[in-house]
């Protein structure tokens, strides 16, 4: 039930069997049938849950929120819109400091607005201009943990998405728990004697 979590499905390939010499010259098959070669992420939308929190956002349709890591400069993408306010002390020319508040994820990565800049929050109750971005090719997005993905050269262009954003909602996981449990039981039966 992790908000914004995307299901992953394994991709298998068949292995060729080959014969190897056994004891007394007997031919024995060697191989295990199949092996997992990759996982395919399911980016389909899931149900929205109302939270009432002003810093929660959900995407209706396709697209991703963009997160900027101020420590590394990395931009990552997520469907998890459970954001919070993150403070930053800025020193002015006269030596005094101002506290700026950014809309950020739980790790301090700043949410980007519709122009691709970190969102500075001046009114915590107001709707923020949260950007939603479309990635040309979803195949090849690199999963970096916590429901976040980074683009690679294979992904092509990234642009603003026309998808609607709802404040006070979060998108649930798109994993069908009943289906997944059925697959676990099916896999266990495959290997039982």
Predicted feature locations:
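Amphipathic alpha-helical polymerization modules
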Residues: 1-99, 104-193
């Amino acid at each position: 039930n992790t908000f914004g979590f995307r299901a992953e499905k394994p991709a298998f390939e068949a292995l060729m069997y080959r014969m190897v010499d056994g004891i007394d010259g007997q031919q024995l098959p060697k191989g295990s049938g199949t092996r997992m070669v990759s996982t395919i992420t399911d980016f389909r939308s899931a149900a929205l849950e109302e939270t009432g929190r002003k810093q929660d956002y959900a995407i209706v349709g396709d697209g991703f929120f963009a997160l900027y890591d101020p420590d590394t400069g990395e931009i990552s993408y997520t469907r998890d819109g459970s954001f919070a306010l993150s403070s930053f002390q800025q020193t002015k020319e006269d030596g005094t400091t101002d506290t700026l508040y950014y809309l950020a994820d739980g790790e301090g990565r700043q949410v980007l607005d519709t122009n691709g800049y970190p969102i500075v929050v001046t009114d915590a109750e107001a709707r923020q201009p949260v950007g939603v971005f479309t990635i040309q090719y979803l195949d090849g997005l690199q999963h970096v943990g916590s429901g976040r993905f980074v683009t690679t050269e294979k992904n092509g262009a990234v642009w603003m998405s026309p998808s609607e954003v709802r404040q006070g909602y979060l998108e649930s996981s798109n994993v069908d728990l009943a289906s997944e449990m059925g697959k676990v039981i099916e896999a266990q039966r495959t290997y039982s004697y």
